[in-house]
Amino acid sequence: MATVAEQWVLVEMVQALYEAPAYHLILEGILILWIIRLVFSKTYKLQERSDLTAKEKEELIEEWQPEPLVPPVSRNHPALNYNIVSGPPTHNIVVNGKECVNFASFNFLGLLANPRVKAAAFASLKKYGVGTCGPRGFYGTFDVHLDLEERLAKFMKTEEAIIYSYGFSTIASAIPAYSKRGDIVFVDSAACFAIQKGLQASRSDIKLFKHNDVADLERLLKEQEIEDQKNPRKARVTRRFIVAEGLYMNTGTICPLPELVRLKYKYKARIFLEESLSFGVLGEHGRGVTEHYGISIDDIDLISANMENALASVGGFCCGRSFVVDHQRLSGQGYCFSASLPPLLAAAAIEALNIMEENPGIFAVLKKKCQTIHKSLQGVSGLKVVGESLCPALHLQLEESTGSRERDMKLLQEIVEQCMNKGIALTQARYLDKEEKCLPPPSIRVVVTVEQTDEELQRAAATIREAAQAVLL
């Protein structure tokens, strides 16, 4: 039976061959021959190769020009013309051998040279040594780390806190720990560089809204809502985040947090709040922008801040609900793969928190000094003040740009140098021009601390005014 079936199939094949059109048979024959040629032919013929003569080799070597390892850099680049600081960058700072009043370092509460903070750091140094030599998951967790996390959570009135060993890596690690490919992040166009790097690492879909423009943010949220209605299945697994700063590092302006919270609940998004500039500055007790507006901390999904400004230490922290913070212990890159915070710096931060809790009036003092310098700098010829009157890091920008960023920076640097010659230490705000998503205009940054006297604030304003007139007029 099987033999009969095989014969029948063979007959059908022969019959199909006879009935096939001629062009079909020709095409199949050509393809078969081409495949045979590919299988048996060589990729190149040895006889076609010819060796270069010694003279030709020398000519090629002489003509070859290697590409530069790094791009060309101007001799006037700030990184090649740095100032040298001698001693701690406290209230008075010695720059290039000249003593100046410090209006450049982010020592807002003046705790960098506080005797109690230094004593706590020294005691920790004697007990633990300098570093930990390992990440938190590998014998890098010391009892002082747990104490600091507990104190930060208690101070911020959240369930839990987590500390990082470097301030920049805090928000840059926290964002990609939650926001992944396919998620959508709505972020302010003036977001600081650390936020930008976190967004880049997350590989999420980034939507920029105009700086502090709630209407523009709502427009983007509405557009996304319409897109979600077209594909409900995808929308169910797509998370939406709003990322903002309490006080913006690049502009000195405060975020409209009440409006952001309203949009959060209306469009079912999560809020990440970066408070490096507002922690220890805003609010009656220094808890940041949530306390400033009287908003419940539970309305914010994640708060991050560094400890390198108000706390005068190093590192950063995130705080929020326990399940949110615990996720970072497994997914926060800067937490899992970096050596933990040196214990002496954790001890210093704890003592700084003690001082903040014992002396809440310090925040009102800082606010008053910020308002004083903000008012004193109004009307400086050729310069405009950018930032809120309650921000301790103001920006002075040119009223009218020359049309060249390099030229603008050169003019501002001349003002900085003239002020330094008169005993006022300032600095320009520095950016990685080619990597910034929205590059801010050149500016001089003026930093206020509680240690500066009213006389020094007025003197600084007068010095800036004189330097601006000399350079710009």
From Swiss-Prot:
Induction: Expression in increased by palmitate at the protein level, but not at the mRNA level. Expression is down-regulated by microRNA miR-137 and miR-181c (at protein level). Disulfide bonds: none annotated. One of its GO terms (molecular function) is pyridoxal phosphate binding. Its main location: endoplasmic reticulum. Phosphorylation at Tyr-164 inhibits activity and promotes cell survival. It catalyses: L-serine + hexadecanoyl-CoA + H(+) = 3-oxosphinganine + CO2 + CoA; octadecanoyl-CoA + L-serine + H(+) = 3-oxoeicosasphinganine + CO2 + CoA; tetradecanoyl-CoA + L-serine + H(+) = 3-oxohexadecasphinganine + CO2 + CoA; dodecanoyl-CoA + L-serine + H(+) = 3-oxotetradecasphinganine + CO2 + CoA. InterPro entries: Aminotransferase_I/II_large (IPR004839), AON_synthase_class-II (IPR050087), PyrdxlP-dep_Trfase (IPR015424), PyrdxlP-dep_Trfase_major (IPR015421), PyrdxlP-dep_Trfase_small (IPR015422). This is Serine palmitoyltransferase 1.
